[in-house]
């Protein structure tokens, strides 16, 4: 799934700060500074919207009301960003259909945590199918495909790839992978993690997608579709 976020914010400095920060966290960002532009940008199918309350012309609340009436876009989650901080404002925002509410000023790290929490709630818990580029996983059937060609993996290799694709662009140490995949089995050593990483890459290699599993020196491993980090 494309990690595309629409930022609707009329203050240029704030909008550009958020856009730069999220781009560094591997989100695709599109921007709008007013209601009319946001309506046009929504056609680019963002998966989440960061929305300022006070916009030129019409308000963020009116934007939410408009979106919720559009069948194609009604399910897109919305996080409201605003200087309005009263209890009544928060209730009005959430009742209008926003999924979360953050008051200005805010920490970029808090914003990121809120985005990821909404993302997990809306997408990860509902989805039984993960796709990044042309590599996809059917969670229910425990099958992996690249361009509709099935890739045969062992149970452990599948668990490893599934975990990585659930958490793209994040670096995990061998210890963390032991905990997540092998649940701290005392008989499993760090070398076992390295061995399964090699096996997984070997099985992905015939499909030219082994580079998704990347080594981060001194830290561990990550899943990334960015070719600049190709092994």
UniProtKB/Swiss-Prot annotation:
PROSITE patterns: OMPR_PHOB, RESPONSE_REGULATORY. Keywords: Activator, Cytoplasm, DNA-binding, Phosphate transport, Phosphoprotein, Transcription, Transcription regulation, Transport, Two-component regulatory system. Residues 127-225 bind DNA. One of its GO terms (biological process) is phosphate ion transport. Phosphorylated by PhoR. GO terms for molecular function: phosphorelay response regulator activity; transcription cis-regulatory region binding. Gene3D superfamilies: 3.40.50.2300, 6.10.250.690, Winged helix-like DNA-binding domain superfamily/Winged helix DNA-binding domain. GO terms for cellular component: cytosol; protein-DNA complex. It is found in: Cytoplasm. InterPro entries: CheY-like_superfamily, OmpR/PhoB-type_DNA-bd, Sig_transdc_resp-reg_PhoB, Sig_transdc_resp-reg_receiver, WalR-like, WH-like_DNA-bd_sf. SUPFAM superfamilies: CheY-like. Coiled coil: none annotated. Pfam families: Response_reg, Trans_reg_C. The modification 4-aspartylphosphate is found at residue 52. Residues 4-119 form the Response regulatory domain. This protein is a positive regulator for the phosphate regulon. Transcription of this operon is positively regulated by PhoB and PhoR when phosphate is limited. NCBIfam families: PhoB. This is Phosphate regulon transcriptional regulatory protein PhoB. It comes from Haemophilus influenzae (strain ATCC 51907 / DSM 11121 / KW20 / Rd).
């Amino acid at each position: 799934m494309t990690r595309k976020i629409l930022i609707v914010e009329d203050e240029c400095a704030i909008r550009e700060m958020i856009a730069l920060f999220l781009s560094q966290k591997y989100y695709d960002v599109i921007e709008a500074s007013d209601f009319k532009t946001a309506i046009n940008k929504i056609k680019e199918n963002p998966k989440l919207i960061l929305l300022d309350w006070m916009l030129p012309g019409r308000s963020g609340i009116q934007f939410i009301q408009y979106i919720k009436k559009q069948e194609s876009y009604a399910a897109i989650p919305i996080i409201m960003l605003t200087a309005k901080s009263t209890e009544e404002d928060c209730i009005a925002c959430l009742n209008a259909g926003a999924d979360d509410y953050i008051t200005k000023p805010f920490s970029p790290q808090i914003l990121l945590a809120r985005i990821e929490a909404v993302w997990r709630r809306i997408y990860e818990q509902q989805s039984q199918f993960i796709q990044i580029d042309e590599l996809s996983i059917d969670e229910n059937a425990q099958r992996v495909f690249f361009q509709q060609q099935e890739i045969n993996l062992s149970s452990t290799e599948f668990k490893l790839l599934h975990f990585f694709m659930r958490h793209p662009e994040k670096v995990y140490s061998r210890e963390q992978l032991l905990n997540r995949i092998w649940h701290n089995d005392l008989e499993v050593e760090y070398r076992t993690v390295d061995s399964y990483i090699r096996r997984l890459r070997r099985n992905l290699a015939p499909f030219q997608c082994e580079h998704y599993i990347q080594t981060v020196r001194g830290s561990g491993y990550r899943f990334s579709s960015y070719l600049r980090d190709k092994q």
